[in-house]
Amino acid sequence: MKVHLIRKETIEAYAEKNARSKSSFKVWLTVVKFANWQTPESIKETFGAADLLGNGTNRVVFDIGGNNYRMICKYAFGKNQVHLFVCWIGTHAQYDKLCKHNEQYTVNHY
């Protein structure tokens, strides 16, 4: 199923503010645009370094830019498309701070 990315402008705004990340997020956006996912495991097939968070959250963490950036998204597989909601974007170090408090399961900054 095609991916319906919700909050694409959030990714673009982050990339504009963090110029070093721009090309990496552009590549990620292009891959998602042409992705065809049937199950959560399909996400991992497309992005081998992605982590499905579990705990009933339907969240995935994407490693972007050679693991310099992390993006948490919530996914919902619908009848005809996959809805992907951007929940959080930051550096790997910022992500590690979230994880210390188990906030990766609930954070919603966008």
Show the residue positions of the predicted features.
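Basic, Lys/Arg-enriched alpha-helical interface segments
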Residues: 1-68, 76-85, 92-110
